[in-house]
């Protein structure tokens, strides 16, 4: 069953064909045990893959592929990493990317493909001053 409307499919195919320059890897971590939204998340990813040949999938089992879990520092499932062909930008989505999160994952795919972001020059300048690793976490609720 399709999760995206036909209108959304047409829009996203056009958007991706016009705006994706470089290949993007979706790295998906699932778990066979106790993963409430792994199936639905995989269904969304499968639909995204059908929209552009510049998007590919690498899939891991959180419980079995422990080296990959360690390499990508994955904390829970379902987990989606949006990465470039040869670079992991640290973008992680935990849980199902539905609602407002779907728009965010589309933006992440476009930004990774174009090796850009939406940061101002001033913000980029300030970020260059940071000398220690840090972790930004954004929590979203539908209310």
Please give the residue ranges for each predicted region.
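N-terminal leader/targeting and pre-domain segments
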Residues: 1-25, 101-133
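Catalytic cores of large soluble enzymes that bind and process phosphate-bearing ligands
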Residues: 4, 37, 78, 97
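Local sequence-structure signature of Cys/Sec-based thiol-disulfide redox active-site neighborhoods
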Residues: 10, 14-52, 128-143
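Short coil/turn segments at secondary-structure boundaries
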Residues: 36, 56, 93-96
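N-terminal, well-ordered alpha-helical segments
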Residues: 39-46, 67, 78, 103, ...
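Thioredoxin-like thiol-disulfide oxidoreductase module
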Residues: 54-87, 124
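Non-catalytic, surface beta->alpha helical segment in thiol-disulfide oxidoreductase systems
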Residues: 79-117
């Amino acid at each position: 069953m399709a999760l995206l409307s036909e209108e959304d499919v047409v829009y996203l195919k056009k958007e991706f064909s016009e705006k994706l320059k470089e290949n993007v890897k979706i790295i998906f971590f699932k778990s066979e045990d106790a993963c409430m939204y792994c199936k639905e998340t995989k269904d969304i990813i499968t639909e995204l893959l059908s929209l552009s040949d510049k998007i590919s999938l690498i899939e891991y089992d959180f419980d079995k592929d422990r080296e990959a879990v360690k390499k990508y520092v994955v904390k829970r499932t379902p987990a989606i990493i949006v990465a470039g062909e040869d670079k992991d930008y640290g973008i992680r989505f935990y849980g199902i990317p539905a609602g407002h999160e779907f728009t965010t994952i589309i933006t992440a795919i476009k930004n990774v493909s174009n090796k850009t972001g939406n940061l101002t020059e001033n913000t980029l300048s300030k970020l260059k001053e940071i000398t220690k690793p840090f972790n930004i976490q954004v929590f979203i609720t539908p209310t």
